[in-house]
A protein has these predicted regions:
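Mobile active-site "lid"/loop adjacent to the S-adenosyl-L-methionine
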Residues: 127, 163-202, 221-228, 250
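Helix-to-beta-strand junctions that scaffold the AdoMet/dcAdoMet cofactor pocket
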Residues: 114, 210-212
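S-adenosyl-L-methionine
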Residues: 124-159
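A short acidic, Gly/Pro-enriched loop at the edge of an enzyme's catalytic core
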Residues: 90-91, 155-166
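Conserved class I S-adenosyl-L-methionine
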Residues: 92-101
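Class I S-adenosyl-L-methionine
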Residues: 162, 215-218, 223-330
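Polybasic, low-complexity RNA-engagement segments
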Residues: 1-14, 18-41, 273-276, 283-436
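Conserved SAM-binding loop of SAM-dependent methyltransferases across substrates and taxa
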Residues: 102-115
Length: 436
């Protein structure tokens, strides 16, 4: 792997005796890993568990496998898994993932929340926010909204609101060079300084949203001191209410430069790619805040259609605020402020759509619910799964009463479909379809 001369000089000076091992690590294959999803009812025994993190396993997963399609597994390399683990938000808390795409850290945070509390998952880039929505929907979480806006606009709505803020900042990406060698072409001597300033600009607004007594997790996938310890020093200098919290150094982690409380991950020490993580605690006394919540905007007919569907097909009562956007029905987490001035990419859990005096359940609802929460479900075989994901109707071995059924693959929800006799009509979203 070829590096710019300035990069070589920089890390020879920074790492000294370790520099040779550091550069040699780039000739080794990038480490692949994934996480399992604890929100899913049916779990499996996967091999090669990562000792440092819950739900983590070494290895590769196929994006066309049933485990991936049902949201049971999510691909994420080991070092990146450390960020949400450092955050480890408590159940029922309010969490912000400030720069969230493609969704690895958000889905990991949702694992800790366990369908309680609230996650606001923000991504300013519209194309990347669509990928974020897709990944969160597949994960099956109910307590998350996805926003597509800037930190300054979010701060006007969520001032002093979040118990945990995770900011995995846009960075020079040095830690991903082994995984994505093409990224090297963007690196130049001043690039880390340029990115460090961007990180500070975003944090200037982002920190306004941290509640008294809350925690900030700042991370990057680079080793640049300008973007890491330099930003940590800036945070402490400009935010006297924040103090660093020591991160336990798990196998292969290193202390940060000048800030031993922070953590660095190098590929010649840690079995993974590159990462930096810092944890801050707000010293202010936590306050009880009251949020003026919105009200359901369903009309009488829509309310009746939803209640009829829920009574007939669901065994559980879904907790949250029902809101209609166009003809689409969403379930929003409780405790949200007015979001009318925020660009939203996903308004909570999409329940379905109203069509000509009937209600059709969404794929998102069917993948979020467990089989214990629905009245009727049908387990697809692997051959039937292959037919369904390619957009075909599926023929069952026996007939069923006509109506809506939750589809299951290996016991986990895979959307709703309408069954007529022994035929499963295809309701798998066209944008997700693929051929096996």
């Amino acid at each position: 792997m070829q590096f710019p001369s300035d990069f070589i000089e920089k890390y020879n000076n920074l790492l000294r005796d370790e520099a040779e091992d550091f550069f040699a690590s780039f000739d080794q294959e990038a480490v692949s890993a994934y996480r399992t999803n604890p929100l899913k009812k049916q779990q499996k025994d996967f091999p090669d568990a990562i000792p440092e993190t819950p739900w983590g396993h070494y290895g590769k997963i196929s994006g066309k496998s049933a485990d991936h399609a049902t949201g049971l597994v999510y691909s994420q390399e080991p070092a990146a898994q450390m960020v949400a683990q450092v955050a480890a938000p408590s159940k029922g808390s309010r969490v912000l993932d400030l720069a969230a795409a493609p969704g690895g850290k958000s889905t990991h945070l949702l694992s800790y929340l366990d369908n309680t509390g609230l996650l606001v998952s923000n991504e300013i880039n519209p194309k990347r926010s669509k990928i974020l929505v897709e990944n969160i929907e597949r994960f099956g979480a109910r307590n998350v909204i996805v926003t597509n806006t800037s930190a300054d606009k979010l701060a006007k709505v969520f001032k002093n609101y979040f118990d945990t803020i995770v900011f995995d900042g846009p960075c020079s990406g040095e830690g991903m060079f082994r995984k994505d060698p093409d990224a090297i072409q963007y690196w130049h001597k001043e690039y880390p300084n340029e990115l460090a300033q961007l990180q500070k600009d975003i944090l200037s607004d982002g920190l306004k949203m941290l509640a008294p007594g809350g925690q900030l997790i700042y991370s990057t996938c680079t080793w640049s001191p300008e973007e890491n310890e330099g930003v940590v020093a800036w945070i402490l200098e400009n935010n006297p209410d924040l103090e660093l919290v020591a991160i336990p150094k798990l196998n292969g982690m290193s202390d940060g430069i000048d800030f031993p409380e922070t953590a660095r991950m190098y590929p010649h020490h840690f079995k993974g790619e590159g990462q930096f993580v810092a944890k801050f605690q707000d010293k202010r006394v936590p306050e009880q805040t009251r949020i003026k919540e919105g009200k359901s905007n369903l009309n009488k007919e829509q309310k009746q259609l939803w209640e009829d569907f829920a009574k007939k097909h669901l065994k559980t009562r879904l907790d949250g605020l029902l809101q209609v956007f166009g003809d689409n029905l969403y379930l929003l987490p409780k405790g949200l402020p007015d979001l009318s001035k925020v660009k939203i990419a996903r308004n909570g859990l999409h329940l379905g759509v109203f069509k000509k005096k009937r209600f059709e359940p969404s794929f998102a609802l069917g993948i979020a619910l467990t089989s214990d929460e629905v009245v009727s479900s049908i387990e697809l075989t692997q051959d039937q799964f292959a037919q369904y994901v390619s957009g075909n109707v599926v023929t069952l071995d026996q007939t069923h009463p006509n109506g809506w059924y939750q589809l299951l693959v290996d016991g986990n929800g895979f959307g709703f479909a309408k069954v007529v006799g022994n035929t499963v009509k295809n309701f798998y979203p066209k944008g997700l379809r693929f051929h096996l």
